[in-house]
């Protein structure tokens, strides 16, 4: 078991990192442009989820999966907006309150107020969030896990108070700035990660985003983009045929775009495509497509076994890991270069066993 070090943030102007690594793991872009191993992805996280006692009541919300399982493969960048903005621990509880116009909307912002005192933290929190997110951009995050229901960090359905009524219509002030400034970044709440499909999708997006950023922050060329896209074809197809087709057209017409427009558009559509959760039906279609490359190489009995496993997954009888393991076995056995290089076969560390549950 790798050694984990836990560093408590003391200066909000310096990104503080908890480093958690596992030997011999790397997300690799195996082409002529990026052949080095990538470091464990850096993930922003609400500090209380790591077990730090920074909650308003002096407690924490340690998440076992994030700390003990996922944490072995990533580098955490912990943030507690409420502590870092100067509220202290323990502290008065805060909540979101609708503006005088009524239910919040884009034109009707909410305020962040102390529950008892009514102290208004809105301006300070918004300014802090803008500054802190600028800092976070410099550490090249690959994802972010936010604390659900938090008036600062909640991503969706945060309680908003208005004239004695409460609606689940808000978003934390820090979370709002984060997703506005980093629109392609994989962001999720810890509560939703209890759903196996959402968990697998988030982790998949984290590692894909890291590979994507490694490409476009380097000295990329249209040729390297074509190679990158080719390796991700099946993975993209498993999420959305429409997104897959749109990216294919973009890559085919690279000469029509400036480098900046090509980079911005490809990254936006790539991440939007992966954000659509893959279904058993989509996975089954992709694996059937892959079998087309194998049909002349494997024996009838092996083909029937693989087809049966794919159909069982489509019907919800077996998890994705069953047909994927069989498919990966035949791809490696016959050394099929195109399929062997597909990120779809192993989009995240196998040790996480995420495909055992979807």
Feature map (PLM): residue ranges:
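Short beta-strand segments
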Residues: 46-47, 80, 145-149
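Short catalytic helix/loop segments, enriched in acidic residues and glycine
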Residues: 59-76
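Glycine-rich anion/phosphate-binding loops
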Residues: 117-136
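Short, surface-exposed acidic-centric catalytic microdomains
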Residues: 80-108
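Internal, conserved structured core segments that host functional sites
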Residues: 132-216
């Amino acid at each position: 078991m790798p050694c984990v070090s836990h560093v408590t943030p003391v200066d909000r102007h310096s990104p503080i990192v908890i480093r958690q690594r596992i030997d011999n793991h790397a997300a690799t872009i195996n082409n002529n442009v990026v052949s080095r191993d990538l470091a464990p992805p850096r993930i922003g996280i609400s500090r209380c989820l790591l077990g730090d006692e920074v909650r308003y009541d002096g407690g924490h919300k340690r998440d076992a999966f994030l700390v003990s399982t996922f944490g072995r493969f990533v580098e955490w960048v912990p943030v507690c907006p409420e502590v870092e903005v100067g509220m202290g621990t323990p502290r008065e509880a805060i909540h979101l309150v609708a503006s005088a116009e009524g239910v919040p909307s884009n034109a009707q912002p909410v305020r962040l107020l102390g529950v008892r005192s009514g102290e208004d933290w809105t301006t300070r929190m918004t300014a802090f969030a803008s500054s802190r997110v600028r800092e976070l951009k410099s550490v090249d995050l690959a994802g972010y896990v936010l604390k659900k229901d938090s008036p600062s960090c909640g991503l969706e359905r945060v309680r908003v108070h208005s004239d004695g009524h409460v609606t689940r219509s808000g978003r934390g002030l820090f979370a709002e700035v984060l997703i506005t400034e980093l629109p392609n970044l994989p962001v999720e709440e810890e509560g939703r990660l209890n759903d196996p499909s959402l968990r697998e999708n988030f982790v998949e997006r984290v590692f894909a985003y890291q590979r994507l950023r490694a490409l476009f922050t380097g000295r990329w060329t249209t040729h390297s983009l074509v190679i990158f896209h080719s390796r991700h074809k099946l993975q993209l197809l498993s999420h959305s045929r429409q997104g897959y087709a749109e990216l294919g057209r973009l890559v085919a017409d690279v000469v029509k775009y400036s480098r900046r427009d090509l980079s911005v558009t490809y990254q936006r559509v790539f991440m939007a495509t992966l954000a659509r959760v893959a279904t058993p039906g989509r996975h089954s279609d992709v694996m059937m497509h892959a079998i087309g490359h194998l049909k002349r190489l494997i024996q009838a009995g092996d083909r029937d076994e693989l087809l049966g496993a794919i159909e069982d997954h489509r019907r919800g009888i077996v998890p994705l890991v069953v047909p994927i393991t069989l498919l990966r076995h035949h791809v490696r056995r016959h050394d099929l270069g195109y399929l062997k290089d597909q990120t779809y076969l192993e989009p995240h560390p196998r040790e996480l066993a995420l495909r055992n549950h979807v």
